[in-house]
UniProtKB/Swiss-Prot annotation:
Enzyme class: transferase
UniProt-listed CDD domains: TMPK
Organism: Desulforapulum autotrophicum (strain ATCC 43914 / DSM 3382 / VKM B-1955 / HRM2) (Desulfobacterium autotrophicum)
InterPro entries: P-loop_NTPase (IPR027417), Thymidylate_kin-like_dom (IPR039430), Thymidylate_kinase (IPR018094)
GO biological process: dTDP biosynthetic process; dTTP biosynthetic process; dUDP biosynthetic process
Keywords, comma-separated and alphabetical: ATP-binding, Kinase, Nucleotide biosynthesis, Nucleotide-binding, Transferase
Name of the protein described by the UniProt record: Thymidylate kinase
Family statement: Belongs to the thymidylate kinase family.
């Protein structure tokens, strides 16, 4: 089972990963938690380049191909072996992030992005993609608070420094994908409390994947809100 989590900056998706994995584990699903970019040794170096605000002059194509390189290594080293071993993979961002950040927001053609996906990812597709929908104003306010509280670091804040219009294009890009692939996407309202969002996630997984996760415990929730 392959589950991906997507959303704008500050949508709270990262906060939900640990309780989700704990819930899966309690129900007999051995889960591997991973993320993009930066899930491998090579990927961590690519992540540092991509998210460094000092790299504001990075070209859109450079950004696109760096994400593709990170994903190629990630698939080879983490995702494909885990799925092959029968494990559940829970991934914080995947191909949809490229489609909306580099496509809808940056303006790179869908044709080029699709070509890169076909080379790097081939026919692998998540069983379920959970989209944490949130307005950019609220999301960016959360990220500012996280930076102030030391829960995020300034050396990974390049995307947080983009304009509000950029983040709105990201949000609308995600919603367009969800509308086009309703069988794959589960859209959750990220404005709710962490407990409300978690409950919505688990009930959605049960409904969409035909499984029965039980034993939901609000104590699983990390009190911090991240993107």
């Amino acid at each position: 089972m392959f589950i991906t989590l997507e959303g704008i900056e500050g949508s709270g998706k990262t906060t939900q990963i640990k309780p989700l994995v704990d819930c899966l584990g309690q129900n007999g699903y051995e889960a591997v938690v991973t993320r993009e970019p930066g899930a491998t040794v090579i990927g961590k170096k690519i992540r540092a380049i991509l998210l460094d605000p000092g790299n504001s002059g990075m070209s859109d194509l450079c950004e696109l191909f760096l994400y593709g390189a990170d994903r190629a290594q990630h698939l080879s080293e983490v995702i494909i072996p885990a799925l092959g071993a029968g494990k559940t993979v829970v991934c914080d961002r995947f191909t949809d992030a490229t489609t909306v950040y580099q496509g809808a927001a940056r303006g790179i053609s869908k044709e080029l992005i699709d070509i890169i996906h076909s080379v790097v990812v081939k026919d692998l597709c998540p069983d379920l993609t959970i989209l944490f929908d949130l307005d950019p104003e609220t999301g960016l306010a959360r990220t500012v608070k996280a930076l102030t509280d030391g829960e995020r670091t300034l050396d990974e804040s390049r995307f947080e420094r983009e304009t509000l219009e950029f983040h709105e294009r990201v949000r609308q890009g995600y919603l367009a994908l969800a509308a086009a692939e309703q069988d794959r996407f589960l859209v959750v309202d990220a404005r709710g409390t962490q407990e409300q969002v978690f409950t919505e996630i688990v009930s959605g997984i049960n409904r969409r994947l035909g499984i029965d996760l039980v034993g939901i415990d609000s104590a699983m929730i990390d009190p911090r809100v991240k993107g």
